[in-house]
Every structure is written in structure tokens, then in C-alpha cells.
């Protein structure tokens, strides 16, 4: 029987990989809590059922699994010529990332790449669309090269310039300050910058 573990979420394994020798100090009740709040068993059921899907078909399966309702205004304004860097606010976390990748991936025949948290590389169906960013440890030496290759590829780039999900600030949920990387790299590689704004809420 084939080993499908690469397709699954394994909180124990991720903690060991991210924390190294310190992983043994993480209390078991914390690990169990993490498994519950990320719905590890439920998600792994979804991943097993969709292990044959990669890229945009995987994102479409995610949309169906989440029962996400997406209303789009201005899709007719998406550029048809040239390469773009699409930048967006990040209010809903994974859901807006999945939605944006699905929408743009469908429109541009799968030619999209995300700059994302490297933990998402654990998702086999999403990994081919990802340029990984390490949020918890030292950045890979290959990171500058991967970003450069991404921006110089024939894929459109998707970025959330705040780098993190929106936070409540002064009673309002809003993005942190946007980093300017998307501007400098887009100028260097002659890409148009297209802003996208999300409004929504989790049910």
C-alpha cells in the first residue's frame, strides 16, 4: 500500500520539524489542543479524498469543502496582457488565500504562484503553487533565489503584503503595515500591480 503521509497534516511531525530538540518540551495537552482546533482528523479525511488533485483543482476542492461563497466585483478588469503581481488584504486567513488562488488560477489557466507561510508546503495539492516563507525560524538560503525565479517566471504572483492575517487594532480589524517588497520586485521585473480587496466574515 502506498504511503500517503506526505499528503496529510501531522501536528506532531510539524512541531518536531519546527522546534527541533525543543519539541519534547511542548506539553501533550497543547499538541492535542492544536490537533482539535485545526481539525486535523477532518482535514486529513479531505486530503485523502482529494490526494489526486494538484494546483487549481485542489483549490476548487478546498472551496467546496469550506462551503465558501464568493461574490466577485470587477473581474472584467483583470488584465489579459502582461504579467501581474496581485496584492490583497488578508482578513480571513486561509479562506481568502484559497479563494484568491482559485479565482485567479482559474482565470489564468493555473499560472499563479503564492508567497506563503512555508507550513503550507506540507499540503501536497498546494505546494506546486507556493514560494515558501519561513515565519518561525531562519529563512532558507534559497529564499531570495526562489522569489527572484517566481517574479521572473511566466506565472502571476499573489501576495499578502502585510505578511500576516489582519489584526484588531484600535477596535478595527485591519492589515498590519504592508511591506514594500511587492513594489520593488514588480518594478524590477516589469509587472503590473493589481490591488484586490476582500470583505467578508467567517460563519
Regions found by a protein language model. Give the residues of each.
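Membrane-anchoring hydrophobic helices of lipid-metabolizing enzymes
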Residues: 1-84, 97-99, 109, 127
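Soluble catalytic domains of membrane acyltransferases
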Residues: 69-203
Amino acid at each position: 500500500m502506498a504511503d500517503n503521509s506526505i499528503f496529510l497534516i501531522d501536528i506532531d511531525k510539524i512541531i518536531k520539524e519546527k522546534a527541533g530538540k525543543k519539541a519534547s518540551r511542548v506539553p501533550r495537552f497543547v499538541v492535542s489542543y492544536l490537533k482539535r482546533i485545526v481539525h486535523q482528523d477532518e482535514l486529513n479525511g479531505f486530503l485523502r479524498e482529494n490526494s489526486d488533485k494538484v494546483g487549481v483543482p485542489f483549490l476548487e476542492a478546498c472551496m467546496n469543502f469550506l462551503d465558501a461563497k464568493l461574490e466577485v466585483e470587477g473581474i472584467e478588469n483583470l488584465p489579459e496582457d502582461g504579467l501581474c503581481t496581485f496584492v490583497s488584504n488578508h482578513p480571513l486567513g486561509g479562506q481568502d488565500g484559497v479563494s484568491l488562488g482559485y479565482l485567479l488560477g482559474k482565470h489564468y489557466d493555473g499560472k499563479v504562484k503564492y508567497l506563503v507561510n512555508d507550513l503550507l508546503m506540507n499540503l501536497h495539492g498546494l505546494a506546486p503553487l507556493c514560494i515558501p516563507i519561513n515565519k518561525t525560524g531562519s529563512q532558507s538560503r534559497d529564499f531570495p533565489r526562489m522569489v527572484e525565479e517566481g517574479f521572473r517566471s511566466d506565472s502571476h504572483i499573489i501576495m499578502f503584503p502585510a505578511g500576516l492575517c489582519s489584526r484588531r487594532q484600535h477596535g478595527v480589524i485591519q492589515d498590519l503595515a504592508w511591506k514594500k517588497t511587492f513594489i520593488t520586485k514588480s518594478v524590477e521585473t516589469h509587472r503590473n500591480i493589481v490591488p484586490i480587496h476582500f470583505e467578508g466574515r467567517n460563519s
